[in-house]
């Protein structure tokens, strides 16, 4: 069963390793709040997994233009809700 991983803070090395250990190929990442900073520092995630980021957080942290150049999908709050409905299982990383 695919999992939606909600990443809302900057992952330290230990949390990052835990995440990498449990991620499956069909899992999805959603970056929110300060978690959007991981998109720069942990950009290997962007190439290996389907990922999403909230546009309001990207704008707030000045990362919108950076993320537009990646394969990450930029979404709004209604789309965030739809992701939560679609994925029966979610894990929050913070």
Feature names for model-found ranges:
Residues 2-8, 88-93:
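Short hydrophobic beta-strand segments
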Residues 3-15, 28:
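Short, glycine-rich nucleotide/cofactor-binding loops
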Residues 14, 37-40, 76-79:
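A short, acidic, amphipathic alpha-helical segment used as a generic capping/interface helix at domain edges
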Residues 18-19:
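Short acidic/Ser/Thr-enriched loop-to-helix initiation segments
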Residues 24:
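Short conserved AdoMet
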Residues 29-34, 50-57:
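Short internal beta-strands
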Residues 36-47, 63:
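N-terminal beta-loop-helix "entrance" segment that forms/cooperates
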Residues 65-94:
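C-terminal structural segments of small proteins and small subunits
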